[in-house]
Curated annotation (Swiss-Prot):
Localization, UniProt: Cell inner membrane
Primary location: membrane
Record protein name field: Protease HtpX
Gene3D superfamilies per UniProt: Metalloproteases ('zincins'), catalytic domain
Keyword Transferase: no
Length: 295
């Protein structure tokens, strides 16, 4: 909770600085001179409230959504020795990472994958696919679990949601400025906001949202290196490298993880060229090389 409060305080400061900067550069006067009567301070606050509300709401229901969308079955009482081993391994890794043991689940998927989610590092969920358990060695599975525990211990789910909230705020803000400018200056609407405002705002939100997602994905890729590093500390560097090499050998297998969870899975598929800017995970080769440099 302290992380959320500190981050919100930081971003309120960012919003305030942005408002002051726009005023200093005479943006309010420019808009008013062109017939756009817009209170930028009120608009920034409005966009911040709705921008953060959406991302934080998604964060708070993330565990429930993950269970529903993947069909994850929570292991409350282990029925097999594999489930017993899974619970014991997660318990050990959680203890070593200094967090409360998360819920542990298995979801039905042939692909080798895993994810972590939850609004709090002490109220999280870690789940693995049937494919991962069937085809990976115990050391490799442990390394994957350590990677996911690393996400939880680092508070990545919270941080990514807050970064998304900042992005949402400024996408909404600039889309509405563009919409007002087009409506008042180009189409000369006089009585309230015309149809041009709504069409332009929606289009601008789509375009700006798409471009801004590259920023969120850049942060997500940085986050993966940190989770790999945590996995190496908890399970051993060789085991973490081995797990990533095994994932690399399965890159032809389609990834069917829901979009909302892809950023928190260990395997997100492969994209090339400019599409790489919108990847939630770095290429496996880069992740393996980073671990090798770690020693």
């Amino acid at each position: 909770m302290m992380r959320i409060l500190l981050f919100l305080a930081t971003n309120l400061a960012v919003v305030l600085i942005a408002s002051i900067t726009l005023s200093l550069f005479g943006f309010n006067g420019f808009m008013a001179a062109n017939g756009v009567d817009l209170n930028l301070n009120q608009l920034l606050v409005f966009c911040a409230v709705f921008g953060f509300a959406g991302s934080l709401f998604s964060l708070f229901i993330s565990k429930w959504m993950a269970k529903m969308s993947t069909g994850t079955q929570i292991i409350s009482q282990p029925r097999t020795r594999h489930e017993q081993w899974l619970l014991q391994t997660v318990e050990q890794l959680s203890r070593d990472a200094g967090i409360k043991m998360p819920e542990v689940g298995i979801f039905p998927a042939y692909e080798a994958n895993a994810f972590a989610t939850g609004w709090n590092k002490n109220d999280a969920l870690v789940a693995v696919s049937h494919g991962l358990l069937e085809r990976f060695s115990p050391d490799e599975v442990k390394a994957v679990l350590a990677h996911e525990i690393g996400h939880v211990a680092n508070g990545d789910m919270v941080t990514l949601a807050l970064v998304q909230g900042v992005v949402n705020t400024f996408v909404m803000f600039f889309a509405r400025i563009i919409g007002n400018f087009v409506d008042k200056v180009i189409f000369k609407s006089e009585n309230g906001q015309g149809i041009a405002y709504y069409i332009t705002t929606i289009f601008a939100e789509l375009v700006l949202g798409f471009l801004a997602s590259a920023i969120v994905m850049w942060f997500s890729r940085k986050r993966e290196f940190r989770a790999d590093d945590a996995g190496a500390r908890l399970a051993g560097t060789d085991a973490m490298i081995g797990a990533l090499q095994r994932l690399r050998s399965e890159q032809g297998v389609p990834v069917n993880m829901p979009d909302s969870l892809t950023a928190f899975g260990i395997n997100a598929g492969l994209k090339k060229g400019l599409a790489g800017l919108f990847m939630s995970h770095p290429p496996l080769e880069q992740r393996i090389e980073a671990l090798r440099r770690r020693g």
